[in-house]
Swiss-Prot record:
Its main location: cytoplasm. GO terms for cellular component: cytoplasm. It comes from Clostridium kluyveri (strain ATCC 8527 / DSM 555 / NBRC 12016 / NCIMB 10680 / K1). InterPro entries: Ribosomal_L11_MeTrfase_PrmA (IPR050078), Ribosomal_PrmA_MeTrfase (IPR004498), SAM-dependent_MTases_sf (IPR029063). It is found in: Cytoplasm. S-adenosyl-L-methionine binds at residues 163, 184, 206, 248. The gene is prmA. Methylates ribosomal protein L11. Keywords: Cytoplasm, Methyltransferase, S-adenosyl-L-methionine, Transferase. Belongs to the methyltransferase superfamily. PrmA family. This is Ribosomal protein L11 methyltransferase. GO terms for molecular function: protein-lysine N-methyltransferase activity.
Length: 312
């Protein structure tokens, strides 16, 4: 018998996406998906450039739809109250919440886990890296590096702008001697990409046990032996120093970790930070510079930013 999950759909402004994501990550959320209508308009005009999105979102005229998934439990309704309260409080923080609508539905686990798979096809995420779902065929081209993925319930299919920018940065900076830390690994896609690009050793960390399990499975699918995966909160479980440290989460997390990141990077080590909405680019750049980082490059894709920096 299929299990049922609770799906919380939240309709807010594009400006509020990052804040709402932060609210959700303070609960026992098992999975989050985000669709921005600005992205949807682009996808309607460029139907060949994307792999999956929910056509029901076309009914949303503006803003973004954030879907969060929870197991049925006694604590869920406490979380729901917390979510609604904090979304309503966004205006007091100077953030336009848009509609601020919260809708709750029950979804079948099989529908959630497998219904999207027919839309998820092999996808070129960088110049070399190609993301291939396990169940799809792909004919390798010269110099292709194929990453086999079954994201399951973990965040990280490789199609999001922030993931693609991180992969392109890894393609540019990973060297054979590189030791790479992937903080908030999700499905493990960035850790696997780093390993396949030739990194000597990779450490991946995630707070979500579902993500840790997903990452371990995906690592095994790719027959990789040099990735260590830890269950922990952000920098917990990380030891030693990295040549490259990548975080693809949200701006607030990056802002809170910038000073600590320095302790885990070698001299002139590379910090790849993404998950940053474009409106907060300058805030993150200033914070990095104030903490002794030199900005190497800033890349933008849609409403998202990836910043590559190094210790001065």
């Amino acid at each position: 018998m299929s299990k049922e999950w609770i799906e919380v759909s939240i309709i807010v402004s594009s400006e509020a996406v990052e804040a709402v994501s932060g609210i959700l990550y303070n609960t026992e959320v098992e999975g989050i998906s985000i669709e921005d209508t600005k992205d949807i308009e682009f996808k309607k005009k460029h139907p060949g450039d994307w792999d999956y999105f929910d056509e029901s979102l076309l009914k949303v005229e503006e803003g973004a739809v954030i879907k969060a998934y929870y197991r049925e439990s006694e604590s869920f309704y406490g979380y729901l109250k917390y979510i609604r309260h904090n979304i309503n409080n966004l205006e007091n923080l100077g953030i336009d919440k848009g509609k601020g609508l919260v809708v709750v539905n029950k979804v079948n686990e099989e529908d959630w886990e497998n219904g999207w798979k027919k839309y998820y096809k092999p996808y070129r995420a960088g110049e070399k890296i190609v993301i291939k779902p396990l169940w799809e065929e792909y004919e390798n081209k010269k110099q292709d590096i194929v990453v086999e993925i079954d994201p399951g319930m973990a965040f990280g299919t490789g199609t999001h702008e922030t993931t693609k920018m991180c992969i392109k940065a890894l393609e540019k900076y990973v060297r054979p001697e590189s030791n790479v830390f992937d903080i908030g690994t999700g499905s493990g896609i960035l850790a696997i990409a780093a390993s396949k690009l030739g990194a000597k050793e990779v450490t991946a960390v995630d707070l979500d046990p579902v993500a840790v399990e997903s990452a371990l499975k995906n690592i095994s699918y790719n027959n990789i032996k040099n990735i260590k995966v830890f269950h922990g909160n952000l920098m917990e479980g990380v030891h030693g120093k990295a040549d490259i440290l990548v975080i693809n989460i949200i701006a607030d997390v990056i802002l809170s970790l910038t000073e600590e990141v320095k302790k885990f990077l070698v001299s002139e080590g590379i910090f790849i930070s993404s998950g940053i909405i474009i409106d907060r680019k300058e805030e993150v750049v200033e914070n990095l510079q104030n903490n002794g980082f030199c900005i190497r490059e800033i890349n933008e894709d849609g409403e998202w930013v990836c910043i590559v920096s190094t210790i001065k």
